[in-house]
């Protein structure tokens, strides 16, 4: 389980996140939503152990702050919003970075085929020999997802769940590949891992998230199921838009129809 209690994060003298609680069980996709500047990325980086924080965060019963980088890398992989590569790496070389996990020397034999399998999962078969910088933004995003999948390919390790932390994983993708990536996340969770993802598309969030955490001005505005959190009044207040939340009879999942900005 990922558990956070009273988490606060400051950058310099500015408080970015204040008093946020969160619990995510293995088998779940948890979505963090909120307007730009609400503290989502900062909170995700604290959860994954990439930023210092106040309060408590634990992963699989261990305090994140006490974990060595190699320990954390064995059980969680992080997809950032953007990954700038300055060197002329091929796609295969970028994906293989996910296999390092703090290791040095030769990679274990059982990992040799993982880069190609990961590229196939994100529908980039045959791209391994191409240069990363030559790809479109959406293709680069899928390469980075293949990299993090290599890092935690098996959703369970030594009887413990592994975790994907995804910061806007579908922001550069067309609708087909958005669904492809979210299906990969759902499959990872169903096989015993867990996913924490920052998403902006509220309808995609409703389709895939088991639990939603709504952030507003650095604090948690709401937490719960899609039906509990995607409400007209809450979403209008947090995002400052006029909208209508409906529920089709077929699956009962809420859908969000924006109408206009709040004047």
Residue ranges and their predicted role:
Residues 53-63:
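Conserved ABC transporter NBD signature motif
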């Amino acid at each position: 389980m990922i558990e956070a209690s009273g988490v606060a994060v400051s950058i310099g003298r500015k408080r970015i996140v204040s008093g946020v609680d969160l619990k995510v069980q293995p088998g779940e996709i948890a979505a963090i939503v909120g307007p730009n500047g609400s503290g989502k990325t900062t909170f995700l980086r604290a959860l994954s152990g990439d930023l210092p924080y106040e309060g408590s965060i634990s992963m699989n019963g261990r305090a994140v702050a006490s974990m060595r980088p190699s320990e954390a890398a064995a059980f969680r992989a992080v997809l950032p919003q953007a990954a700038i590569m300055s060197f002329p790496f091929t796609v295969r070389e970028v994906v293989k970075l996910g296999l390092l996990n703090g290791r040095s020397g030769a990679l274990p034999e059982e990992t040799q085929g993982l880069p190609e399998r990961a590229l196939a999962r994100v529908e980039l078969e045959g791209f391994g020999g191409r240069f990363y910088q030559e790809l479109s933004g959406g293709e680069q995003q899928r390469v980075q997802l293949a990299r993090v999948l290599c890092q935690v390919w098996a959703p369970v390790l030594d009887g413990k769940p592994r975790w994907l932390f995804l910061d806007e994983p579908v922001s550069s993708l067309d609708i087909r590949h958005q669904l492809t990536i979210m299906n990969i996340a759902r499959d990872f969770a169903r096989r015993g891992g867990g996913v924490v993802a920052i998403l902006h598309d509220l309808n995609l969030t409703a389709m895939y998230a088991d639990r939603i955490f709504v952030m507003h001005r650095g604090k948690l505005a709401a937490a719960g199921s899609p039906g509990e959190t995607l409400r007209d009044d809450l979403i209008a207040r947090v995002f400052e838009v006029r909208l209508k939340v409906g529920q089709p009879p077929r699956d009962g999942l809420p859908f969000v129809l924006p109408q206009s900005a709040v004047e």
